[in-house]
Amino acid sequence: MSGGVSLGSIGQIANGQPSGHPKGLFYLSFTEMWERFSFYGMSALLTLYMVKELLLPENASHVVGLAALRNMFEFRGPMSDVAFSAIIYGWYAGLVYFTPMVGGWVADRILGAKRTVMIGVVLMSAGHLAMSFYASFLFALLLLILGSGFLKGNISAQVGALYPRSDESLRSRGFTIFSTGICIGAASGPLVTG
């Protein structure tokens, strides 16, 4: 029948989107793409920035808490700027992947996934803004770590919650779109920033 509605278009009409996916999928995919852009862009630049700019004597003295942190890591003796910056990067990367457990707990027990993701986005934005100033460098890293922890696991849970459990095929395609956003952010972060 030429005037009828096809079964394929029922999902599209029900979701209100031409793609058949909920509108929220594209917002969540875009947000996660930028989170991965942030992490991999920082990964490409953090050690280089610290060695070539931040750890220069005239700049390092302005970073709040940097001397104390360096003293803590130099308990076995002095280390080069490269070694110190590599340690900072290692802690940053490790904590970015550890804190989603904390973010998941906060979402499950206190705030809910949506609020936790929003707080994560705000923390990461504030962290990148704070990176603009030498004095707040370590505080900026802390904000980025916490923001990523609040966002990382909870945003995936939100994607899953967009779809009814009865439509695994559409849900699977939605996660493919979401994963594509992750890959685009991860690939473009180091290329654009570095």
Model-found features: residue ranges?
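Intracellular juxtamembrane helix-capping segments at the cytosolic ends
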Residues: 150-165
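Glycine-rich segments within core transmembrane alpha-helices of 12-TM secondary carriers
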Residues: 96, 172-191
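Loop-to-transmembrane helix entry/capping segments in MFS-fold secondary transporters
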Residues: 25, 82-83, 166-178
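Cytosolic juxtamembrane N-terminal segment immediately preceding the first transmembrane helix
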Residues: 1-42
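Central cavity-lining transmembrane alpha-helices of secondary-active solute carriers
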Residues: 86-106, 152
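A gly/Pro-rich, aromatic-decorated transmembrane alpha-helix motif that marks the paired
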Residues: 44, 101-102, 184-194
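C-terminal ends and interior cores of transmembrane alpha-helices
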Residues: 119-139
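Cytoplasmic membrane-interface "Motif A"-like loop-to-helix N-cap segments
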Residues: 109-121, 171
